[in-house]
Amino acid sequence: MSNLQAIIEAAFEKRAEITPKTVDAETRAAIEEVIEGLDSGKYRVAEKIAGEWVTHQWLKKAVLLSFRINDNQIIDGAETKYYDKVALKFADYTEERFTEEGFRVVPSATVRKGAYISKNCVLMPSYVNIGAYVGEGTMVDTWATVGSCAQIGKNVHLSGGVGIGGVLEPLQANPTIIGDNCFIGARSEVVEGVIVEDGCVISMGVFIGQSTKIYDRETGEIHYGRVPAGSVVVSGSLPSKCGKYSLYCAVIVKKVDAKTLGKVGINELLRSIEE
């Protein structure tokens, strides 16, 4: 355990006692160092190690502690003022820094300090919360929200109104993860630490949490909390055991490999689904 991690872990155990007035200098410095590291991409709340996603709980704890050490303050915006504990990521950005970091931010897009945005990303009017990681070449479309500590892969499209759940409210054990080269359709929600593996296509209006049945119609298998790589998913329902009613589920209607995904348009994949 590093010294930085040890400080965070110790502070978290006595978090109820920590306020902006009582926090000691060492703890404040450690928390701020973590937030800066998350902001720059040096740290990630979750990362793939040996093919498996690993959550660094101490980094998540630092994010939670950051709310304990700061008072609300006035934050100036173009159209109005805000009053919050967390600064905005781009508050001190210059044109040179935007150019150097290489992403686009459309007016009214909001990103909190402590979120990382990779090169070639485009942020339409959307919201990215503290601790989140947005991978290279990803589009966060209009009114999409990326929750606290959520991990978004490379070349992902989060369509209009998509919601990717965070870990802070309500408190979750692990962040929601969207793998590389995924398409999440308009108004879909992926929450509660669900993992969408690489190369998935989620149709519009699909809602997936930890308790959602993810039914593979080819194999009959039911998954929870994980969408297997290369899945094309639509909303559906499954009959109850008594046969008197049906309950919502997500349905894997087909699997595609990276080569097919690269050659075939998203709309074609979704429109070619047989009933």
Curated annotation (Swiss-Prot):
GO cellular component term of the entry, any: cytoplasm
Reaction it catalyzes: (S)-2,3,4,5-tetrahydrodipicolinate + succinyl-CoA + H2O = (S)-2-succinylamino-6-oxoheptanedioate + CoA
Localisation per UniProt entry: Cytoplasm
Top-level taxon in the UniProt lineage: Bacteria
CDD domains per the UniProt record, alphabetical: LbH_THP_succinylT (cd03350)
Binding site for substrate: R104, D141
UniProt GO BP: diaminopimelate biosynthetic process; lysine biosynthetic process; lysine biosynthetic process via diaminopimelate
Keywords, in A-Z order: Acyltransferase, Amino-acid biosynthesis, Cytoplasm, Diaminopimelate biosynthesis, Lysine biosynthesis, Repeat, Transferase
Known pathway: Amino-acid biosynthesis; L-lysine biosynthesis via DAP pathway; LL-2,6-diaminopimelate from (S)-tetrahydrodipicolinate (succinylase route): step 1/3
GO molecular function terms noted in the UniProt entry: 2,3,4,5-tetrahydropyridine-2,6-dicarboxylate N-succinyltransferase activity; nucleotidyltransferase activity
Assembly mode: Homotrimer.
Family named by the database record: Belongs to the transferase hexapeptide repeat family.
Protein's name according to its UniProt entry: 2,3,4,5-tetrahydropyridine-2,6-dicarboxylate N-succinyltransferase
Organism: Haemophilus influenzae (strain ATCC 51907 / DSM 11121 / KW20 / Rd)
Gene (name only): dapD
